């Protein structure tokens, strides 16, 4: 079965073709970072308009790369939510319009389920069950993943997501957009231990997170430094922030493995591309004897490949979830725990 995936939940337009026998055939992605940079964040109206411009050229690109023809496609999967309402509507409209023209079924996919399953796109995918650390700009959760559609929330952020804390720290340090990668890059030049920041809820005894206090600690430190902060002071603060965030994420992930008695950890979402986090978890895996799996770096960000994969896996298990009536809704807010099989 060949599935076309369309992702448009925020500021990336992604299309991909996934075959249930041959795997990922091709994926193409357009990022809107350059367009939103001058505003310091995503402008929803601009994001929606750009999705409209980019989707069909990206479709032609994945068809050319894969060698597939439009008639070879068996179904179309699209991101139904959560995300920006206008951006979701663009992707859903394009998916259902193509499906109507080609007489193909469609299936709406939860954006976070796509991230959860994205490590299955590697050459040696992790078998179920596993613990997943889902860490991105809008979400920070630990999940027990028993199978496709069988997800249990073990812990989640009580306030800000880790990615939000990265972005806020970048703004406080006067860094560019997007902030997360900029903070991580600057932290590479920081002196370990020069700035020690709190590790919120590190010893709370549960698997929940909190990053608002860490953001406040960064703000307090910036105010103490005053104006005209030198680059080394910025780098030291960035290093202190990254060290604190990574330690909390790693310690909670290890606790989730211990609680569930599982030996496999999957890391997904944009913050999962962070080098320091990967090194910390990989080091712990070697010492403690568990396996840790990541998607390819190119698939940590939002992408169509994960949507195509999730659509294919769901249609294999539950063909009735696909529809050919081309009536659709989008869900800007959608709890992953309510998804089910």
Curated annotation (Swiss-Prot):
Pfam families: TsaD (PF00814). NCBIfam families: gcp_kae1, T6A_TsaD_YgjD. GO terms for molecular function: iron ion binding; N(6)-L-threonylcarbamoyladenine synthase activity. One of its GO terms (cellular component) is cytoplasm. The gene is tsaD. The keyword tRNA processing applies. GO terms for biological process: tRNA threonylcarbamoyladenosine modification. Required for the formation of a threonylcarbamoyl group on adenosine at position 37 (t(6)A37) in tRNAs that read codons beginning with adenine. Is involved in the transfer of the threonylcarbamoyl moiety of threonylcarbamoyl-AMP (TC-AMP) to the N6 group of A37, together with TsaE and TsaB. TsaD likely plays a direct catalytic role in this reaction. Belongs to the KAE1 / TsaD family. Its cofactor is Fe(2+). Binds 1 Fe(2+) ion per subunit. This is tRNA N6-adenosine threonylcarbamoyltransferase. CDD domains: ASKHA_NBD_TsaD_bac (cd24133). It is an enzyme of class 2 (transferase). Substrate binds at residues 134-138, 167, 180, 274. It is found in: Cytoplasm. It catalyses: L-threonylcarbamoyladenylate + adenosine(37) in tRNA = N(6)-L-threonylcarbamoyladenosine(37) in tRNA + AMP + H(+). Its EC number is 2.3.1.234. Fe cation binds at residues 111, 115, 302. Gene3D superfamilies: 3.30.420.40. Keywords: Acyltransferase, Cytoplasm, Iron, Metal-binding, Transferase, tRNA processing.
């Amino acid at each position: 079965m060949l599935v076309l995936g369309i992702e448009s939940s925020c500021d990336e337009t992604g299309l991909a073709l996934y075959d249930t026998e041959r795997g990922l055939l091709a994926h193409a992605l357009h990022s809107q970072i350059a367009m939103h940079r001058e505003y310091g964040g995503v402008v929803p109206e601009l994001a929606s308009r750009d999705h409209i411009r980019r989707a069909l050229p990206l479709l032609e690109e994945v068809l050319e790369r894969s060698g597939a023809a439009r008639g070879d496609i068996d179904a179309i999967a699209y991101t139904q939510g959560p995300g920006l309402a206008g951006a979701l509507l663009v992707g859903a409209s394009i998916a259902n319009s193509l499906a109507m023209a080609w007489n193909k079924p469609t299936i709406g996919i939860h954006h976070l389920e796509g991230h959860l399953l994205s490590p299955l796109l590697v050459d040696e995918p992790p078998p179920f069950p596993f613990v997943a650390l889902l860490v991105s700009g809008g979400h920070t959760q630990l999940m027990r993943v028993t199978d496709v559609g069988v997800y249990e929330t073990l812990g989640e952020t009580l306030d800000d997501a880790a990615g939000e804390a990265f972005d806020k720290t970048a703004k406080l340090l006067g860094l560019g957009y997007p902030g997360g990668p900029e903070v991580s890059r600057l932290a590479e030049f920081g002196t370990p231990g020069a700035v020690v920041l709190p590790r919120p809820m590190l010893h709370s005894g549960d698997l929940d997170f909190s990053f608002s206090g860490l953001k406040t600690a960064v703000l307090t430190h910036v105010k103490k430094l005053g104006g005209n902060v030198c680059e080394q002071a910025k780098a030291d603060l960035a290093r202190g922030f990254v060290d604190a965030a990574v330690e909390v994420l790693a310690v909670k992930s290890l606790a989730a493995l211990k609680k569930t008695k599982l030996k496999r950890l999957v890391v997904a979402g944009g913050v999962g591309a962070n080098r320091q986090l990967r090194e910390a978890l990989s080091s712990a895996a070697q010492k403690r004897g568990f396996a840790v799996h990541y998607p390819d770096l190119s698939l940590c960000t939002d992408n169509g490949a994960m949507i195509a994969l999730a659509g294919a896996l769901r249609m294999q298990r539950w063909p009735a979830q696909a529809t050919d009536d081309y009536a659709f809704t989008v869900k800007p807010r959608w709890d992953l725990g309510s998804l089910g099989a």
